[in-house]
Amino acid sequence: DLLISVAANSGALLGFSEKIHYTHSDSLQELLIAPSDIVVSDFPIGYYPVNERAKNYQTAFPEGNSFAHFLMFEQNVNYLKESGWGIFIVPSDIFETDKSSVLMGWLKENVHIQAFLSLPADLFHKNGMKKSIIIVQKIGGKSLQAEQVLLGEIPDLKNAQKMQSFLDIFHNWSAKMI
């Protein structure tokens, strides 16, 4: 409820309150919402305990509990329009686990990975807790794979010069993409 309130207040301050629909639910149940042009989400890390529901997803593991962040990735993309954009905060090591091939196979069929940006290390107490931002575009419509996927690390937020340089690079990249 708190995150919904913060998001709604932020949307209102930006003048978007009429254009944004907020939903609070088990994010893996069937949602009664229309596909969106953009989805932004911070996926929790861990296992999803409702195996009966998880088996409806291609990113579910054949046995045992599946990774919640894999299932939520799939669910969020399912609710994107063709050519829609997903901006997701994911574990930095999402492609380095022994189960990553499950997600990678699904991603190749459903999205173009357009960017993968590591968040600054000083935001996390432990290296194993690091997160990154992945930007994807759902395949279909006018979607195109970027000629060059934007890969990098977002600099320390306190370093104004490096941050400005990063923002310039990101702006130039996004101008070509959008």
Question: Model segments located where?
Answer:
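General small-molecule cofactor/ligand-binding pocket signal
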Residues: H21-S25, L117, G152
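Conserved S-adenosyl-L-methionine
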Residues: D1-S41, G46, S92
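Mobile active-site "lid"/loop adjacent to the S-adenosyl-L-methionine
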Residues: D42-M72
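Local beta-strand N-terminus motif with an aromatic residue
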Residues: P35-D37, I113, K131
